[in-house]
From Swiss-Prot:
Root EC class: isomerase
Protein family: Belongs to the HisA/HisF family.
Pathway: Amino-acid biosynthesis; L-histidine biosynthesis; L-histidine from 5-phospho-alpha-D-ribose 1-diphosphate: step 4/9
Main location: cytoplasm
Keywords, in A-Z order: Amino-acid biosynthesis, Cytoplasm, Histidine biosynthesis, Isomerase
UniProt-listed Enzyme Commission number(s): 5.3.1.16
GO molecular function, one term: 1-(5-phosphoribosyl)-5-[(5-phosphoribosylamino)methylideneamino]imidazole-4-carboxamide isomerase activity
Disulfide bridges in this chain: none
InterPro entries reported in the protein's UniProt record: Aldolase_TIM (IPR013785), His_biosynth (IPR006062), HisA_bact_arch (IPR006063), Isoase_HisA-like (IPR044524), Isoase_HisA-like_bact (IPR023016), RibuloseP-bd_barrel (IPR011060)
Catalytic activity: 1-(5-phospho-beta-D-ribosyl)-5-[(5-phospho-beta-D-ribosylamino)methylideneamino]imidazole-4-carboxamide = 5-[(5-phospho-1-deoxy-D-ribulos-1-ylimino)methylamino]-1-(5-phospho-beta-D-ribosyl)imidazole-4-carboxamide
One record GO biological process: L-tryptophan biosynthetic process
Record gene name: hisA
Protein name: 1-(5-phosphoribosyl)-5-[(5-phosphoribosylamino)methylideneamino] imidazole-4-carboxamide isomerase
Amino acid sequence: MLLIPAIDLKGGKCVRLRQGRMEDDTVFSDDPVAVALHWAEAGAKRLHLVDLDGAFAGQPVNADIIYHIAQALPDMDIQVGGGIRDSDTIQTYLDAGVRYAIIGTKAINAPHFVADACLEFPGHILLGLDAREGKIAINGWSKLSRHNLIDIAQRFEKDGVEAIIYTDIQRDGMMKGVNIEATSELAKAINIPVIASGGVSSLTEIEALCQHEQDGIGGAIIGRALYEEKIQLAEALAIAKRLSGESTA
């Protein structure tokens, strides 16, 4: 079970939002590179970087910071989302040392882009599905689409994405607990790993997610709980390793 610290970037700073609202942010650090180094030292094997400004702008805004993090941690698996709308952006990130590009809004607006990206960058494409009450949200969560979560996941699984990152918007940044039931339901419906995101708030939830690993839950992204020290990463990694019975790498 992968446990993946989140670094959300807004205005060049490391922030956390509540339910994806850009106006409801908390700044945790003015130095995202130092934050990334901290999580690496604590044992993280993968980092989840989100260009929040880019998600709304439709193109990278905080790319320079992401490049600096990738350069500082050449052995770290880094996944990046936010503002990825064309293959040139994916290529630039991969050339900079990023391991995975997360396609979200573009997948809904132009489904063929996912298939094309999987062919052009095999093994490097993740699908980010952000949902509220089972419906997919796009454009930095500012717009709710008519698309059903599981239907969309099954469609894009066939295109060759490596994994799906599922975020329950209503739980994100609220410290109310990850939606294990919905995450497990999604994981059972497809044959690629699902990475849980949104609301992970305690070690108990980490344990519960690990118990659903056989359903296809391959990891969890942790944000506010780490920054507010509700969860200590090293302790969480030890629990995940013990319950998974194998390395969390």
